[in-house]
C-alpha cells in the first residue's frame, strides 16, 4: 500500500511518515490537466489500515483512497476475470480469440483504428476480454456463497473484466459510479497519470445546477405514419465525438479557446485526446456496433443472442450513467464537464430540428435525443441521418414508426400504435403506477381500438368505438359491476403516518388509508405501499375522510362513483383531447368539457 505527497515533503509530513514507519522514494507522474511530468514522494506502508491514518493526518496526499487490492492489480497491469498462466514468477494473460471472429471485428472497426488509435486500443482490449469463455469454477472457490443462474455469472465476469473489479464485487455491487471509477483509475494508472483528488477533478468548483436536456413542445394532434429518429446513446456519443473529458474541458492551451461550447463559456481542447472521451467512446462503440447487432443476428443460437443482449444491457447501464456521475458523484464530478455534455446534447437536437425543417421534413416533437417526423419520405430521412453524421459526427437512426401517433399538449406524454398494432404509451396519467386497474384497463381498451387505423376514415370509426368503450365502462361503474380490487389506488408512503396525524392540516388520501390500517392493527411505516378505494365522505377521528383501505370496504355502495367518473375522464383527456372525441353527440361535448 502506498500514496503520494509533494516532493520534497514538508517537515510535518516527514514526521507523520516516520510515525507510520513509511518508506519513501522519488517518482515521476504526469499531471492530468497540464500533461507535464511532476516529481512526487511515494510513501509505502506495511499495513493497508495505515492508509486511513495517513488520510486523516496529511492534507496534501494523492491516491490514498484507492483500495489496496485494486491498486496492486492496476500497478501489475492485471485484469480480474480473464485467464492467466504462470510463467516462472510472472503471470501472463492466456486470452485466445477465434481468428474468424477477430477478422470480423477488425473489419468492422478499421476506420476507428485509422482515425482514433487510442480508442481502438481500448475497444480491442475490451473485445478480447469479453470474448473469453466463462471458466467452469465452483462459485464458492471465488468467495461467492450463492447459487446464480448462468446469465448472472456471465454478466459478473463481463463487468469484472471491463471495470477491473473482483468478481464478488462485480456480482454484488450495484453502484455504477464504482464501476466507472475503477475503469478511469485503471486507465490513468496505466498511463502513469496521477489520479487527481476529488476537489482537483472538480477544478475546485462547488456543485451547481446544470442545465438539462432540450424539449421542443409537441404540435398537438393526431398523425399517421410518424417516424421517430433518435441519437444512439446521445450523451456517450457527445462525450466521444467532441472529446469531452476532465482535462479537455477548459484546458490551458490558448489555441483551444476558440473551440467554444454552444451556449456556455466553456471551450474544449483540440490538442489532446481526453481520457474519459476515449473510455466512454470505446464502451459505446463496443455496445452499439458489436453486442447490439449480435443480439439480433439470426445466424446465432438463441442462447448466444440472449447473452449478447445481456452484455449490451450491461454496457448500456454504464453508458447511461456516464453523464450523471459527472454531476454529483465525488471523485467523478466536474460541473464544467457536466455542463458541456448537456450543452452539446441540446445543440445536437436543436441543429437536427432545424436541418429537418430545411429538408422539408415536418418535425412534430423533440425530446432530449428523439425527433418525431410527420409522414416523411424515406429518402429525406436517409438524407437527414447522413447529414447529421457528417455535420455533427453523431449517429442518428430510425427508432420506431407509428401508424398512428397522438400528441397531447403536455410534454413527455404521448401514445402511438406500432405497425404491428402494438400500443406504446408514454407519460399518460391513466397508466401511472398508482392508478387503479379500472382506469388502466379502460385506457388500454381505448388504445386498442386504434390498432388497425391507417387513415382518417378508419380514425373516425375508431373514435366512435372509443366513445362506446368509455360509456360502457361508466355504465358498469354506476351499476356496481366493477370489482373493488379494480378500483384500488396503490401509493407508497413517503412520510411517517403518525407524524402526519398530529399535524393540524387536511390529510392526504394515502395517509387517511394508513391511519385506518394502523387503527385496525396493521403495521404501516414510511415506505409502505397502501391500497385504498375512494368512498363517499365520512367523519373519522373528527376529520373528513374520503378513502378507505381496500380490505375495509364492505360493499360497492360505499364507492364514490362520481369521483371515479371524474378521474377517468381527467386521465383520458390528456391523450384524447387532441383527437376531439366527444361523449355526447347531441351537445357535441369533448372529453375536456367534463374536466
Describe each PLM feature range.
Residues 106-108, 131-132, 229-231, 375:
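Residues immediately flanking
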Residues 134, 145, 402-406:
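A short acidic, often aromatic-flanked loop/helix-cap motif at beta-alpha or helix-coil junctions
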Residues 46-49, 130, 377:
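Helix N-cap/beta->alpha junction signal
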Residues 132-141:
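Short, basic/polar, glycine-containing "phosphate-handling" surface segments that engage DNA
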Residues 99-113, 274-331:
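Active-site cores of enzymes that catalyze phosphoryl transfer or operate on phosphate-rich substrates
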Amino acid at each position: 500500500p502506498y500514496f503520494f505527497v509533494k516532493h520534497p515533503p514538508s517537515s510535518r509530513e516527514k514526521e507523520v511518515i516516520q510515525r507510520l514507519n513509511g518508506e519513501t522514494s522519488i517518482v515521476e507522474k504526469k499531471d492530468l490537466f497540464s500533461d507535464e511530468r511532476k516529481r512526487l514522494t511515494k510513501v509505502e506502508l506495511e499495513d493497508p489500515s495505515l492508509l486511513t491514518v495517513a488520510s486523516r493526518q496529511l492534507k496534501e496526499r494523492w491516491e490514498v483512497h484507492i483500495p489496496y487490492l485494486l491498486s496492486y492489480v492496476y500497478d501489475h497491469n492485471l485484469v480480474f476475470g480473464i485467464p492467466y498462466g504462470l510463467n516462472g514468477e510472472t503471470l501472463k494473460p492466456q486470452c485466445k480469440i477465434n481468428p474468424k471472429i477477430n477478422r470480423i471485428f477488425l473489419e468492422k472497426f478499421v476506420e476507428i483504428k485509422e482515425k482514433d488509435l487510442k480508442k481502438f486500443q481500448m475497444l480491442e482490449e475490451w473485445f478480447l476480454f469479453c470474448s473469453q469463455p466463462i471458466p467452469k469454477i465452483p462459485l464458492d472457490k471465488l468467495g461467492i456463497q450463492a447459487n446464480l443462474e448462468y446469465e448472472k455469472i456471465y454478466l459478473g465476469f463481463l463487468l469484472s473484466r471491463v471495470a477491473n473489479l473482483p468478481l464478488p464485487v462485480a456480482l454484488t455491487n450495484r453502484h455504477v459510479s464504482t464501476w466507472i471509477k475503477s475503469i478511469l483509475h485503471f486507465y490513468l494508472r496505466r498511463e502513469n497519470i496521477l489520479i487527481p483528488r476529488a476537489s482537483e477533478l472538480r477544478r475546485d468548483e462547488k456543485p451547481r445546477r446544470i442545465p438539462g436536456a432540450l424539449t421542443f413542445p409537441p404540435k398537438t394532434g393526431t398523425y399517421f405514419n410518424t417516424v421517430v429518429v433518435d441519437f444512439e446513446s446521445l450523451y456517450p456519443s457527445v462525450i466521444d465525438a467532441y472529446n469531452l473529458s476532465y482535462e479537455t474541458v477548459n484546458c490551458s492551451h490558448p489555441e483551444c479557446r476558440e473551440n467554444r461550447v454552444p451556449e456556455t463559456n466553456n471551450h474544449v481542447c483540440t490538442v489532446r485526446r481526453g481520457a474519459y472521451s476515449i473510455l466512454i467512446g470505446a464502451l459505446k462503440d463496443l455496445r452499439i456496433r458489436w453486442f447490439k447487432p449480435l443480439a439480433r443476428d439470426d445466424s446465432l443460437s438463441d442462447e448466444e443472442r440472449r447473452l449478447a443482449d445481456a452484455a449490451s444491457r450491461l454496457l448500456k447501464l454504464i453508458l447511461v450513467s456516464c453523464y450523471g456521475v459527472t454531476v454529483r458523484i465525488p471523485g467523478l464530478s466536474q460541473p464544467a464537464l457536466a455542463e458541456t455534455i448537456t450543452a452539446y446534447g441540446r445543440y445536437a437536437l436543436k441543429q437536427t430540428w432545424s436541418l429537418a425543417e430545411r429538408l422539408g421534413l415536418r418535425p412534430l416533437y423533440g425530446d432530449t435525443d428523439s425527433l418525431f417526423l410527420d409522414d416523411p419520405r424515406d429518402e429525406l430521412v436517409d438524407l437527414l441521418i447522413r447529414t447529421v453524421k457528417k455535420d455533427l459526427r453523431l449517429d442518428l437512426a430510425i427508432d420506431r414508426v407509428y401508424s398512428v401517433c397522438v400528441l397531447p399538449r403536455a410534454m413527455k406524454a404521448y401514445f402511438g400504435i406500432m405497425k404491428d398494432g402494438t400500443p406504446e404509451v408514454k407519460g399518460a396519467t391513466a397508466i401511472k403506477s398508482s392508478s387503479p386497474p379500472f382506469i388502466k384497463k379502460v385506457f388500454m381498451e381505448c388504445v386498442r381500438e386504434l390498432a388497425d387505423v391507417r387513415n382518417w376514415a378508419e380514425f373516425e370509426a375508431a373514435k366512435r368505438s372509443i366513445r362506446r368503450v368509455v360509456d360502457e365502462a361508466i355504465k358498469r361503474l354506476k351499476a356496481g359491476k366493477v370489482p373493488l380490487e379494480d378500483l384500488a389506488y396503490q401509493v407508497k408512503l413517503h412520510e411517517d403516518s403518525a407524524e402526519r396525524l398530529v399535524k393540524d392540516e387536511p390529510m392526504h388520501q394515502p395517509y387517511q388509508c394508513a391511519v385506518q390500517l394502523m387503527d385496525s392493527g396493521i403495521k404501516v411505516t414510511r415506505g409502505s405501499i397502501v391500497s385504498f378505494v375512494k368512498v363517499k365522505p365520512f367523519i373519522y377521528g373528527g376529520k373528513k375522510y374520503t378513502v378507505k383501505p381496500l380490505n375495509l370496504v364492505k360493499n360497492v355502495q360505499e364507492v364514490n362513483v362520481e369521483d371515479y367518473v371524474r378521474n377517468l375522464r381527467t386521465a383520458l383527456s390528456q391523450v384524447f383531447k387532441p383527437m376531439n372525441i366527444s361523449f355526447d353527440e347531441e351537445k357535441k361535448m369533448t372529453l375536456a368539457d367534463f374536466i
